[in-house]
Amino acid sequence: MLRIALPNKGRLSEDTRGLFNDAGLEVRSSGERALTASLGGEFEAIFVRAQDIPEFVADGAADAGVTGWDLVSESGRELTSHLDLGFGRCRLVVAAREDAGVRSLEDLARQAPPMRVATVFPNITRRFFEMAGVPVTVVPVSGAAEIAPHLGIADVVVDLTSTGSTLRVNGLREVETVLRSSAHLITAVAGPRNGDVSRKQEFDDLVTALASVIRARGQRYLMANVPREVLDAVRAVLPGLNGPTVIDIADHSRYVAVHAVVSADTIYRTISQLRALGGEGILVTRIERLIP
């Protein structure tokens, strides 16, 4: 049985549990404070801090894990991402005070060295500025890096942001994006896919289950009755995965039923186009899982 390390609290934990539940891998634990749980009876889950998951996976305490890519990068461990889970999206950015006159890394390089940079991500920050050729002194903090320039303990910050609103509220301006992050399913480089056949199959089944839910979230299943003579035009409107499925309707020679998978982003336009072609009885449903 594979052991999967999952975040033990916060939004990342909630979104992870939601994804696993939707994939049929219900998290079954003995209580809210339980350290382990069963995942649909197929896998064992252990609950740890998101920032510790890269270490647990790299050291073999867990076969796989779910955590933010920012934390994986900060750990410096050799880990492989098998799936971007599509939530927990954010950016790690360099930000300076609005009144500092800093608009680019070139502006930072012209400042009297060394610049002081406050961050929760000292390893990523050092690597970034070394590659940029900008000398800095990294000031590690455990949180609230955005107030460091106002307290005089740093000139700029490297901090996470989703919308940039927290930075703006604190009078900071984004200068450069260091890293884009989201939640990933990770393993060690020599992970389950390099193990025995049964463990490889277990892990492949896990990836397939999670990916099927992620893929389905942006799609809808559309069904409609359309005049037979406009099928060519309907095929142009409903490309689907491999084109629409066309089904004869009993006792109705003029109309056929078409079924197709359609992007949720374009569903309203698709419905309008079908109606213009004489489509009727249009039904749209959500898709729980999609395996191409």
Swiss-Prot record:
EC identifiers of the protein: 2.4.2.17
Localization: Cytoplasm
Reaction(s) catalysed by this chain's protein: 1-(5-phospho-beta-D-ribosyl)-ATP + diphosphate = 5-phospho-alpha-D-ribose 1-diphosphate + ATP
Biological or metabolic pathway of the protein: Amino-acid biosynthesis; L-histidine biosynthesis; L-histidine from 5-phospho-alpha-D-ribose 1-diphosphate: step 1/9
CDD domains membership: PBP2_HisGL4
Any one GO molecular-function label of the UniProt entry: ATP phosphoribosyltransferase activity
Record keywords: Amino-acid biosynthesis, ATP-binding, Cytoplasm, Glycosyltransferase, Histidine biosynthesis, Magnesium, Metal-binding, Nucleotide-binding, Transferase
Signal peptide location: none
Keyword Cytoplasm: yes
Control of this protein's activity: Feedback inhibited by histidine.
Function statement: Catalyzes the condensation of ATP and 5-phosphoribose 1-diphosphate to form N'-(5'-phosphoribosyl)-ATP (PR-ATP). Has a crucial role in the pathway because the rate of histidine biosynthesis seems to be controlled primarily by regulation of HisG enzymatic activity.
Protein name per Swiss-Prot or TrEMBL: ATP phosphoribosyltransferase
Record gene name: hisG
